[in-house]
């Protein structure tokens, strides 16, 4: 009975020690693979970042050109009600409260300066 226990104990110790060695080797292999993967991901990330920066530069360039050439957009003409806090009267007009006619509307209108 003692020989069976000793044999079992010996086999158990060998299995555990060999299993640990395999586990350490597997760990080292996984670390190598993840390091290689990280370097690839870093490269891909940098490449994507460069492309996005180029695209952003092109878009900003187009926006600046558009703003230089653009006309005034959607404005309110003379005699049209406007908002006191957000006047969108066309150039040369001011958002004012009416003096005589239209006082009963309690609204502001676009008038010439």
Swiss-Prot record:
Transmembrane segments: none annotated. Residues 22-74 form a propeptide. It comes from the Eukaryota. GO terms for molecular function: sodium channel inhibitor activity; toxin activity. It is found in: Secreted. The presence of a 'disulfide through disulfide knot' structurally defines this protein as a knottin. This is U11-theraphotoxin-Hhn1a. It comes from Cyriopagopus hainanus (Chinese bird spider).
